[in-house]
Amino acid sequence: MILVWGNSLQGQEVSRGRLGILLGGMNGVSYDYALTDHLEVGGTAAFVLGLGYGGSSKSFQFDGLTPLLELAPRYYFSRREEGQSFNKGGYLSLRLGAQIDDWRLFPSKAGQESNVKSHYTLGMAPTFGWSFPLSSKSYLRLGIGLLFYRAKKSHAGDSYYAGQSYWVTTQRLSDAPFLLDIGYGIAL
């Protein structure tokens, strides 16, 4: 009985891990591992494109590329088909990330001249999205979520508070910024 069960498992074994390249809102490398036909865990090392809409300035803002490490379990509503490289369809995800704001590339002029410096940010974002396979080796992923964060900041310049650091966190649900995820992935 055990030998038959063991042989049937070996016959069904498919590659569950996938190394890839991400382009879009996050630009870097990812590794996704399918735990089941519905559940996968993804890890990402990337540069995040700092785009946003300023509520007070009523304008779009660019704030450079920030290094990010992210872990994101995703539950797909549709079942992963045999031989398919990517899950497709709707998913729920809990994205956990850490970004190092001090290492930002191409920071905005406003960010460089600001008296408040951001050092690093820890975030959690429940996300709903949709994944579209474009070919056997690529996909397009679109998602939206709410970002809950905790950021380490400090005062700079010649002010009385210069050098003092403090934490900024999401205080209320209404303060949580929307997280838009638009990404193109290619399996290696």
Task: List each language-model region with its residue ranges.
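Residues that define the transmembrane beta-barrel architecture of outer-membrane proteins
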Residues: 15-17, 23-25, 63-69, 118-124, ...
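Membrane-embedded beta-strand positions of outer-membrane beta-barrel proteins
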Residues: 17-23, 43-45, 71, 92-96, ...
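Flexible, solvent-exposed loop segments that connect beta-strands
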Residues: 51-63, 98-121, 151-173
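C-terminal segment of classical bacterial N-terminal signal peptides
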Residues: 2-10
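Short loop/turn motifs that connect adjacent beta-strands in outer-membrane beta-barrel proteins
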Residues: 9-16, 38, 78-90, 134-138
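Outer-membrane beta-barrel "beta-signal"
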Residues: 67-78, 174-188
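Short glycine/proline- and aromatic-enriched beta-strand/turn motifs that initiate or cap beta-hairpins
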Residues: 9-60, 64-65, 101-103, 181-188
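Mid-chain, structured segments of secreted extracytoplasmic proteins
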Residues: 58-99
